C-alpha cells in the first residue's frame, strides 16, 4: 500500500569524515536528495467486483516517496567546520541537474505514453461509437424486421402444418371408409361364394337327376322297343292265326260246300271266328292303350326332366355370370384399394418429408435466433468491456493530469543556489530533527456490477505515513 524511499546523505556519500563517522547511528544527515518513483498501471479488467485505488494527490498510479527536502530557509544549519569547499555545491548542482535531466527524460517518456494512451482512447471511443450505432441498428431495425420476418414465416409454417394435418385427417377418414367398403365387399364376396357353392351343389344334384332321368328314359325306350317288338310279334302271330283261321274257314267252306248236309259246322266256325276276332281286337286295344299310357308317362317325365335340366342350366349360367361380375368387381375394388393405399403411403411419405423439412427450417431459424441473441449479448459484453476500459483510461488520464499538474507546480518552484549558502558551524546535537515522513491519503472505491449495471458502490479513506 505504501512505497518508501531510502534517503542517503549526499555529503556523507561524497565526503565522509571522522566527524560524521563518530556520530551515533541515530544521527541523520540534512543534505539529502529526493527520489520519486512513478508506477503506471494498466487498464482495469471488467469483473463482478472492482476496486479502484486513488491516492492524494497523485493517485495509486503515481506513488511518491519523499525524503527531506533541502530548503534555504531551514534555521540553525551549522557545520562542524568553519569553511567548506564550494566544490560540494557544484557537485550537488551537477547531481541535481542530472536528476532533473533524468526526470525530464522520464516526463518525456510519460508524455509519449500519455499521447499513445490518448490515441488509444480516441480509437476506442470511435470503436465504441461504431458499436453503439450497430447496437442501436440491431435493436431498432433488425429486431423488428427479423422478428416480423420470423413470425410471418412461423405463421406460414404453422398454417402449412395445420393444412397437412387436416389433409392427413381427411385421408385417414377416406382410408377408413374404403376399409369399411372393402370389408363389406369381402363379406358380400363370401356370401356370393357360399351361394356359388350352393348353386354348384344344386347343379351337381340336378346333373345326378338328369343322369337318372336319362337312364330312366333309356330304360323306357328299351321297354318301348321291347313292347313294340312284342306288339309286332303279337300282330304277326295274330295275322298268322287269322290266316290259319281263314284257311280253316276256307277248308270248312269247301267241306261245307262239299258236304251240304252239315249246316251246323259253319255256324260254329263263324262263332269261333267272331270270338277270336273279339279277343284279338280287345287284346290289341288294351296293348295300344297301355303303350299310349306308358309313352305319355315317359314323355311327361322326360319333359319334366328336360325342364328341370334347362332351368338348372339357366340358373348355372346366371350364377356363373354373377360370379364373373363379382370377380371383376372384386378385382376392380382390389385395384382401387391398392391405388388408394399407394396414394396414402405416398402422401404419408411426402407429409413426413415436408414435416422433417419444416422441423429443420424451424430448428435452423431457432439456431439463427439464438446466434443473433448470442451475438447481441457478445456486442453488449464488448460494449461493457469498452466502457470499463474507457473508465479505467479516464482514471489513468486523470491520474496523469494530476501528475503533470504536480510536476508543473514543482518545476515552477524556485531552486536554491548552493553557491550562495553561508555554511556555519553548528551543534548537530542541538538541531531539531526534520520530519522525513510524508502523509498519503488512500481512497479505496469498490464498484459491483451485474450485466453491465452498477448495483453497489462503496468508498473508504485511509491515511498512511511514509
Swiss-Prot record:
Positions of post-translational Phosphothreonine modification: 20, 426, 436, 446, 458
Post-translational changes noted in the entry: One of the most prominent phosphoproteins in various cells of mesenchymal origin. Phosphorylation is enhanced during cell division, at which time vimentin filaments are significantly reorganized. Phosphorylation by PKN1 inhibits the formation of filaments. Filament disassembly during mitosis is promoted by phosphorylation at Ser-55 as well as by nestin. Phosphorylated at Ser-56 by CDK5 during neutrophil secretion in the cytoplasm. Phosphorylated by STK33. Phosphorylated on tyrosine residues by SRMS.
Span list, region Linker 1: 132-153
UniProt motif ([IL]-x-C-x-x-[DE] motif) ranges: 326-329
Modified residues (N6-succinyllysine): 120, 129, 188, 294, 445
Domain IF rod: 103-411
Region annotated Linker 12, chain positions: 246-268
Record InterPro entries: IF_conserved, IF_rod_dom, Intermed_filament_DNA-bd, Intermediate_filament
Subunit structure: Homomer assembled from elementary dimers. Identified in complexes that contain VIM, EZR, AHNAK, BFSP1, BFSP2, ANK2, PLEC, PRX and spectrin. Interacts with BCAS3. Interacts with LGSN. Interacts with SYNM. Interacts (via rod region) with PLEC (via CH 1 domain). Interacts with STK33. Interacts with LARP6. Interacts with RAB8B. Interacts with TOR1A; the interaction associates TOR1A with the cytoskeleton. Interacts with TOR1AIP1. Interacts with TOR1AIP1. Interacts with DIAPH1. Interacts with EPPK1; interaction is dependent of higher-order structure of intermediate filament.
Entry's family note: Belongs to the intermediate filament family.
Protein name: Vimentin
Upper classification of the organism: Eukaryota, Metazoa, Chordata, Craniata, Vertebrata
Amino acid at each position: 500500500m505504501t512505497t518508501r524511499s531510502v534517503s542517503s546523505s549526499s555529503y556523507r556519500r561524497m565526503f565522509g569524515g571522522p566527524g560524521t563517522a563518530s556520530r551515533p547511528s541515530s544521527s541523520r544527515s540534512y543534505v539529502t536528495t529526493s527520489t520519486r518513483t512513478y508506477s503506471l498501471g494498466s487498464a482495469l479488467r471488467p469483473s463482478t467486483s472492482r476496486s479502484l485505488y486513488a491516492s492524494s494527490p497523485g493517485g495509486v498510479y503515481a506513488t511518491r516517496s519523499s525524503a527531506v527536502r533541502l530548503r534555504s530557509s531551514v534555521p540553525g544549519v551549522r557545520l562542524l567546520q568553519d569553511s567548506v569547499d564550494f566544490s560540494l555545491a557544484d557537485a550537488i548542482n551537477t547531481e541535481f541537474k542530472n536528476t532533473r535531466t533524468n526526470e525530464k527524460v522520464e516526463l518525456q517518456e510519460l508524455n509519449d505514453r500519455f499521447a499513445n494512451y490518448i490515441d488509444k482512447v480516441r480509437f476506442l471511443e470511435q470503436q465504441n461509437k461504431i458499436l453503439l450505432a450497430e447496437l442501436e441498428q440491431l435493436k431498432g431495425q433488425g429486431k423488428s424486421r427479423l422478428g416480423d420476418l420470423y413470425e410471418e414465416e412461423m405463421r406460414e409454417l404453422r398454417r402449412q402444418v395445420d393444412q397437412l394435418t387436416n389433409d392427413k385427417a381427411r385421408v385417414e377418414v377416406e382410408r377408413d371408409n374404403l376399409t369399411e367398403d372393402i370389408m363389406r365387399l369381402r363379406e358380400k364376396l363370401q356370401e356370393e361364394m357360399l351361394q356359388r357353392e350352393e348353386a354348384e351343389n344344386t347343379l351337381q344334384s340336378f346333373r345326378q337327376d338328369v343322369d337318372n332321368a336319362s337312364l330312366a328314359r333309356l330304360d323306357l325306350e328299351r321297354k318301348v322297343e321291347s313292347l313294340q317288338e312284342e306288339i309286332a310279334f303279337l300282330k304277326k302271330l295274330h295275322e298268322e292265326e287269322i290266316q290259319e283261321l281263314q284257311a280253316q274257314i276256307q277248308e270248312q267252306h269247301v267241306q261245307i260246300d262239299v258236304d251240304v248236309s252239315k249246316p251246323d259246322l259253319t255256324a260254329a266256325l263263324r262263332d269261333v271266328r267272331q270270338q277270336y276276332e273279339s279277343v284279338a281286337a280287345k287284346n290289341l286295344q288294351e296293348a295300344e292303350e297301355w303303350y299310349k299310357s306308358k309313352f305319355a308317362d315317359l314323355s311327361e317325365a322326360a319333359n319334366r326332366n328336360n325342364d328341370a335340366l334347362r332351368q338348372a342350366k339357366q340358373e348355372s349360367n346366371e350364377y356363373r355370370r354373377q360370379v364373373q361380375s363379382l370377380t371383376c368387381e372384386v378385382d376392380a375394388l382390389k385395384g382401387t384399394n391398392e391405388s388408394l393405399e399407394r396414394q396414402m403411403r405416398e402422401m404419408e411419405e411426402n407429409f413426413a418429408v415436408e414435416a422433417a423439412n419444416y422441423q429443420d427450417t424451424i430448428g435452423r431459424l431457432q439456431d439463427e435466433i439464438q446466434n443473433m441473441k448470442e451475438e447481441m449479448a457478445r456486442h453488449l459484453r464488448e460494449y461493457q468491456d469498452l466502457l470499463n476500459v474507457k473508465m479505467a483510461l479516464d482514471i489513468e488520464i486523470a491520474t496523469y493530469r494530476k501528475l503533470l499538474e504536480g510536476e508543473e507546480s514543482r518545476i515552477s518552484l524556485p531552486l536554491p543556489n548552493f553557491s550562495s549558502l553561508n555554511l556555519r558551524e553548528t551543534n548537530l546535537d542541538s538541531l531539531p530533527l526534520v520530519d522525513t515522513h510524508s502523509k498519503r491519503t488512500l481512497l479505496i472505491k469498490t464498484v459491483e456490477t451485474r450485466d453491465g449495471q452498477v448495483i453497489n458502490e462503496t468508498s473508504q479513506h485511509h491515511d498512511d505515513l511514509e
